[in-house]
């Protein structure tokens, strides 16, 4: 016998953080940053067959100032990295980043000086999506997993501290090509 049974109908008991998390997850506005073949699959996800609109993502934003989710789809060159960081910095808080595909996550098969070995060395990444390229169903699953992460996001000072810690950890992370013995 809890308080829920004593309250008349039409009332909902929750915390402010949970209510804000529910609202934020229900209205993500993605910014496109399609650089390679993963961008084709990302565009297919927005088409009628998969219909991202049912998850509150009606339109991909061309302006970073109107977006709160950056989907980095494809490989990032060393010359493109500062542009990626500039677009990330222009996005309003709260913001999330999804690395789509092996190239965005770890540099993929392009282990050379011209390709960034993981976009997490440029911006903090909230969700990694493997695949070469990942199917639209996989992107939708990653977005739904990101929704769950967004629902549990902290507010206020705790959120700022958490974001700064994530960004500092990403800046000081060991490059993927320096890690030895990963496949053994």
Curated annotation (Swiss-Prot):
One GO MF term: NADH:ubiquinone reductase (non-electrogenic) activity
Signal peptide as annotated in the record: none
InterPro entries: NADH_UbQ_OxRdtase-like_20kDa, NADH_UQ_OxRdtase_20Kd_su
Record region (Disordered): 164-184
Main localization (coarse): membrane
Localization (cell): Cell membrane
GO cellular component, as recorded: plasma membrane; respiratory chain complex I
E.C. number: 7.1.1.-
UniProt GO BP: aerobic respiration; electron transport coupled proton transport
Binding site for [4Fe-4S] cluster: 37-38, 103, 132
Named cofactor requirement(s): [4Fe-4S] cluster
Listed Pfam families: Oxidored_q6
UniProt membrane topology term: Peripheral membrane protein
Catalytic activity: a quinone + NADH + 5 H(+)(in) = a quinol + NAD(+) + 4 H(+)(out)
SUPFAM superfamilies reported in the protein's UniProt record: HydA/Nqo6-like (SSF56770)
Cofactor notes: Binds 1 [4Fe-4S] cluster.
Keyword annotations: 4Fe-4S, Cell membrane, Iron, Iron-sulfur, Membrane, Metal-binding, NAD, Quinone, Translocase, Transport
PANTHER family: NADH DEHYDROGENASE, NADH DEHYDROGENASE [UBIQUINONE] IRON-SULFUR PROTEIN 7, MITOCHONDRIAL
Complex formation: NDH-1 is composed of 14 different subunits. Subunits NuoB, C, D, E, F, and G constitute the peripheral sector of the complex.
Name of the featured protein: NADH-quinone oxidoreductase subunit B
Species: Acidothermus cellulolyticus (strain ATCC 43068 / DSM 8971 / 11B)
């Amino acid at each position: 016998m809890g308080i829920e049974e004593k309250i008349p109908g039409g009332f909902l008991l929750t915390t402010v953080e949970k209510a804000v998390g529910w609202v934020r997850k229900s209205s993500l506005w993605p910014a496109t940053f399609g650089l390679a073949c993963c961008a084709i699959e990302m565009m297919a996800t927005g088409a009628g067959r998969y219909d991202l609109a049912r998850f509150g993502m009606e339109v991909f934003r061309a302006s970073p100032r109107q977006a709160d989710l950056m989907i980095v789809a494809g490989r990032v060159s060393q010359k493109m990295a500062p542009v990626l960081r500039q677009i990330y910095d222009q996005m309003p808080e709260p913001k999330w980043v999804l690395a789509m595909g092996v190239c965005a996550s770890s540099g993929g098969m392009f282990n050379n000086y011209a390709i960034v070995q993981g976009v997490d060395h440029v911006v903090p990444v909230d969700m990694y999506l493997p695949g070469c390229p990942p199917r639209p169903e996989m992107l939708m699953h990653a977005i739904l997993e990101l929704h769950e992460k967004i629902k549990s996001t902290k507010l206020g000072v705790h959120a700022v501290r958490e974001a700064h810690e994530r960004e500092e950890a990403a800046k000081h992370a060991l490059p993927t090509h320096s890690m030895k013995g990963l496949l053994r």
